[in-house]
């Protein structure tokens, strides 16, 4: 998925910002969270997050759900490099494995499992 944040900000500026953030807040992870383009889920009000390194993926999903005011019965999927990360994984380990060369971790979210195999509905 192409990041709008990357399109709007040149690489050197993004890299410098991520480095500044990591120096100032070494226990935090700079995350860019964007909606998957064709998803019908609500658009998030802010893209940039400073996430505690000991936060789990599940806790981060909870933060996103709150920001987009998603009702409990609605599904949300988050993707890192077009893969669903494990809910119990720490954001710090996801960051170390998947951070971009600019120093940010890019996460996309959707109301559908757009990159994995299709989920079948039970009748």
Swiss-Prot record:
Q: What Pfam families does its record include?
A: ATG8
Q: Topology relative to the membrane, per the entry? A: Lipid-anchor
Keyword annotations of the record:
Autophagy, Cytoplasmic vesicle, Lipoprotein, Membrane, Protein transport, Transport, Ubl conjugation pathway, Vacuole
Query: What InterPro entries does the record tag this protein with?
Result: Atg8-like (IPR004241), Ubiquitin-like_domsf (IPR029071)
Is Lipoprotein among this UniProt entry's keywords? Answer: yes
What CDD domains is this protein classified in? Answer: Ubl_ATG8
Q: Where is the protein localized?
A: Cytoplasmic vesicle, Autophagosome membrane; Vacuole membrane
Q: What is this protein called?
A: Autophagy-related protein 8
